């Protein structure tokens, strides 16, 4: 994954993690997972609900916060 992709991805996922925002993660096969982001790295997201699941990023289509979040893409890019 290029560094450019992580300029948006990392700050967004980190905001969701730090603020304990519930998320719905849709996989490329259509499956919907729900929980809180516990951790993430370049390749995986740890999603916690009743159990912790390791979800590979290449399998993720969409991450949808369960409530509004104050995230500005331009600020995330400017800070890096």
Curated annotation (Swiss-Prot):
Q: Which GO terms describe its molecular function?
A: RNA binding
Which GO cellular component does the record give, naming just one?
cytosol
- Extract the InterPro entries matched here: Hfq, LSM_dom_sf, Sm
* Residues that span the membrane, as ranges: none
Per the record, the GO terms for biological process are: regulation of DNA-templated transcription; regulation of RNA stability; regulation of translation, ncRNA-mediated
Provide this UniProt record's keywords sorted from A to Z: RNA-binding, Stress response
Ubl conjugation in keyword set? no
Sm domain mapped to chain residues: 10-69
Question: What Pfam family does this protein match (any one)?
Answer: Hfq
Q: Quaternary arrangement and interactors, per the entry?
A: Homohexamer.
Family statement drawn from the similarity comment of this UniProt entry: Belongs to the Hfq family.
- List, alphabetically, the HAMAP family matched: Hfq
* Function of the molecule: RNA chaperone that binds small regulatory RNA (sRNAs) and mRNAs to facilitate mRNA translational regulation in response to envelope stress, environmental stress and changes in metabolite concentrations. Also binds with high specificity to tRNAs.
Its name, as the record gives it, is RNA-binding protein Hfq
Q: Which organism is it from?
A: Leptothrix cholodnii (strain ATCC 51168 / LMG 8142 / SP-6)
């Amino acid at each position: 994954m290029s560094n450019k992709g992580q300029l948006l991805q990392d700050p967004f996922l980190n905001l969701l993690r730090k603020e304990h925002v519930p998320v719905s993660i849709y996989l490329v096969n259509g499956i919907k997972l729900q929980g809180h982001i516990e951790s993430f790295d370049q390749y995986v997201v740890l999603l916690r609900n009743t159990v912790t699941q390791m979800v590979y990023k290449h399998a993720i289509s969409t991450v949808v916060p369960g409530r509004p979040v104050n995230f500005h893409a331009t600020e995330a890019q400017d800070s890096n």
